[in-house]
Amino acid sequence: NICKNADGTLTECAEITGLYAWKLSSGELVLLKGDVRFHDVVFGYVSEKTVLHDISLFAKPGQKIAFVGSTGAGKTTITNLINRFYDIQAGQITYDGIDVKDIRKDDLRRSLAMVIQDTHLFTGTIADNIRYGKLDATDEEIREAAKIANADSFISRLPQGYDTMLYGDGSSLSQGQQQLIAIARAAIAKPPVLILDEATSSIDTRTERLIEKGMDAIMEGRTVFVIAHRLSTVRNSNAIMVLEKGEIIERGSHDELLEQKGRYYQLYTGQFELE
């Protein structure tokens, strides 16, 4: 928790009443709202080979930004930069107008939640795995988060319920069940920024619908970035970024992009392979 000194100043960075605060490298404390911007970003995993070229985009709280494109187009790389897993070669990434380089990495990543296909679960109970999103969460908060994520139903059917032990990265659960727990973890954390990597086609249709509903529930009011694998799920995005060879070649809403009859139109009508 953030603690007050005798003079009333705040000393640590943590969640305050649902808001996230950062201590900058300058020592200044700021609250994160979730305005994320890329300004002419250039990036390569090795300096000799650039994989993202002049990427510019912005996302505000309450907006959903979807990235679509073939394998290797740069979708995952952009989300890795949102997390600052890597530093960029040129350009700037800002959060609420603050250069990402001025934000401590631990503070930044605590302000983000990721729901990815290959969910990482820990050895421990299901409750512990959900609580990882908020370490001081009560049992009631954990169950409420699971309900939001549509995970409570399958958890409650397990013999030990929320006390069920998970081993070996949750291998006793299906891939869909693991992802529902990851959504519950994000729901309990209530971060300002979410990164969602859609479920793969290997998940059964019923679980896929539960995952989509859970994701929709945790998106509200947050800045959301989606790595899209099926275009049917991004139609309601505020903006869709079509990537090809590390460049944004088209951007706009679903209807706007269909009207352009460009690459998105080709993807949507099955003329070009998305994966």
Stretches found by the model and what they are:
Residues 2-275:
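ABC-type nucleotide-binding domain
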